[in-house]
From Swiss-Prot:
Listed name of the protein: (-)-beta-caryophyllene synthase ((2E,6E)-farnesyl diphosphate cyclizing)
Organism of this sequence: Saccharothrix espanaensis (strain ATCC 51144 / DSM 44229 / JCM 9112 / NBRC 15066 / NRRL 15764)
Cofactor: Mg(2+)
Pfam family, one: Terpene_syn_C_2
Record SUPFAM superfamilies: Terpenoid synthases
Residues with site note (Plays a critical role for substrate recognition): D86, E160
């Protein structure tokens, strides 16, 4: 086998079945319209760029059993994730406006689902809409843990922005711990339940067994993404990328660094499969019913495995990782400034105000 034409085409053997919702094409126009309606897409150029990222396809791969409005919700969340993430990619570092919006989002996660506050701006209003829709039909326990994962994500973006300016000597392991907060997989795992109409029993979700599987799945996604985005992030002078960290730490050439990341993925896949094969023992030890065990199995298949496999299949096709999509490091990573027009003035309101 010859070398891939680009890092984006690097092969990973993901031993999980390929799956995708049949409703991807049907929900795509509505999802793009939602992004425009909420001010997340402000120009035709941005719309063309996002269209090339194939985010509705990503949702279809992440949530293969989702249909109709459930898949639309998943697609809208994908649009939010990527457009919000890019707001932190600024040549001047972490912007005060991004911090202000993040604080407002963090405040909302502590409140019951409801309409966005007046004058919230596009990012906050869009997330409030997503959160309202996400909570529909879900238990209070799910809402509590889903809000917690969103908080970790919002805080993680701030931490990553600070680390981006100084993380050059840290190990790949340190980097992975930080990136696990911002890659967005843990809110997605929760959304897998919401869009596919089930909930994993709390007692097994919080077991070391399932938490270890979640951590492994997240690290696999991070590492695969880092390989695919190597050229794009190198061109922007990015430091938070496993391949680029290995090049600096070990003075490795690009090829050997990519090969090492491939081995890291293989090791994590092997560990994941060992845990998956022992899941029934954990269910038995927790004295779960047959119906509860079925939900655990579904979580493993249509949340963890579908995210790992779906991410890999998508990243090989998405323009998100192409060199053509990259902007010079002297420019922001976004086309539309969504937080500079946020309308947020001062700190978020205190509880009860």
């Amino acid at each position: 086998m010859g070398r891939p034409a680009t890092p984006q085409q690097t092969a990973f053997h993901i031993p999980f079945p390929r799956a995708i919702s049949p409703d991807v094409s049907a929900v795509h126009p509505g999802s793009m319209a939602w992004l425009r309606r909420h001010g997340m897409l402000r120009s035709d150029a941005s719309a063309r760029r996002v269209d090339g990222w194939r985010l509705t396809e990503l949702a279809g791969r992440f949530f293969p059993d989702a249909r109709g409005e459930d898949l639309r919700l998943g697609a809208d969340v994908m649009g939010f994730f990527f457009l919000f993430d890019d707001q932190f990619d600024h040549p001047g570092g972490l912007r005060a406006e991004a911090v202000a919006v993040s604080k407002r989002l963090l405040h909302l996660t502590s409140l019951p689902a409801g309409p966005a506050p007046e004058g919230a701006g596009p990012v906050v209003a869009a997330w409030a809409d997503l959160w309202n829709r996400s909570c529909q039909g879900m238990s209070s326990a799910w809402r509590v843990r889903a809000a917690r994962e969103w908080r970790r994500y919002f805080v993680g973006n701030l931490e990553e922005s600070v680390a981006r300016e100084g993380m050059s000597g840290e190990s790949v392991e340190d980097y992975l711990r930080l990136r696990a907060m911002t890659i967005g997989t843990t809110p997605v795992y929760d959304l897998c339940e919401r869009t596919q109409h089930f909930e994993i029993p709390d007692e097994v979700l919080h077991s070391h067994h399932v938490q270890a599987m979640r951590d492994l799945a997240t690290e696999i996604v991070v590492l695969c993404n880092d390989v695919a985005s190597t050229i794009k992030e190198s061109a922007r002078g990015e430091t938070l990328n496993a391949v680029l960290l290995l090049e600096r730490h070990h003075e490795a050439e690009r090829g050997p660094a990519v090969a090492r990341v491939q081995r890291m993925v293989e090791a994590r896949l092997a560990a994941f499969r060992r845990l998956r094969d022992r899941t029934s023992r954990t269910c038995a030890a927790l004295d779960l019913t047959a119906e509860q065990c079925d939900r655990v199995d579904r979580y493993v298949r249509t949340a963890l495995m579908s995210v790992v496999r779906g991410n890999y299949d998508w990243q090989q096709r998405s323009a998100r990782f192409s060199a053509d999509d990259a902007r010079p490091g002297s420019l922001p990573g976004y086309l539309d400034d969504l937080v500079g027009h946020s309308g947020v003035v001062g700190p978020p309101p205190v509880d009860g105000s």
